[in-house]
């Protein structure tokens, strides 16, 4: 099984590293093209494009300016340890064993507006470039047109390397839109996480994001390789609901959190 998740806007380049192993991103030539486009933007344009404050726009203008593709442990960090959003809070990669990192490197991929597809141990320099923004480029009006089929092709390579044809979609809709399901060399399974609120079960964004990380951790730490094993997921109170699930959509429910 190959898991795909979204990146995070929040980054951590200070915490102690849980592993010294690293690899290089595989699509840096494309990243360089995007960086050159982004370097033409003023901080005001970045603020408008990304919907962020002037302070954050200045920070990201500086990141674009300082970015260079010679990644080392001194100027970059492994992606799985650099991202720090809700998904990564659930995953807790800082507690992974060497065997966990090895399994994740084979079975987990992070989608990225700048880097396309990242493996967990791929070094990355800090950036903010969300997949859904309207950044004009030679391929078209946005990043979906820039990446085209390349993200799907990279995932197909990973599926072939890790030995089966099942892709577990734990990414957000914004990011998974960069994948072309019709061109995937495999079948898709999407876990869905419902939380109870006032007696009704629904997707609550904060909880769902963390649950995607929890599911990733569950697969990685238990070294799961078959889709039928996913129904055993039970971290932090979630339980599989067979009645609501379908072949390609696994539904997990949790009672209200107080």
Swiss-Prot record:
GO terms for cellular component: cytosol. InterPro entries: YaaA. GO terms for biological process: response to hydroperoxide. Transmembrane segments: none annotated. Belongs to the UPF0246 family. HAMAP family: UPF0246. PANTHER family: PEROXIDE STRESS RESISTANCE PROTEIN YAAA (PTHR30283:SF4), PEROXIDE STRESS RESPONSE PROTEIN YAAA (PTHR30283). This is UPF0246 protein YE0603. The lineage of its organism: Bacteria, Pseudomonadati, Pseudomonadota, Gammaproteobacteria, Enterobacterales.
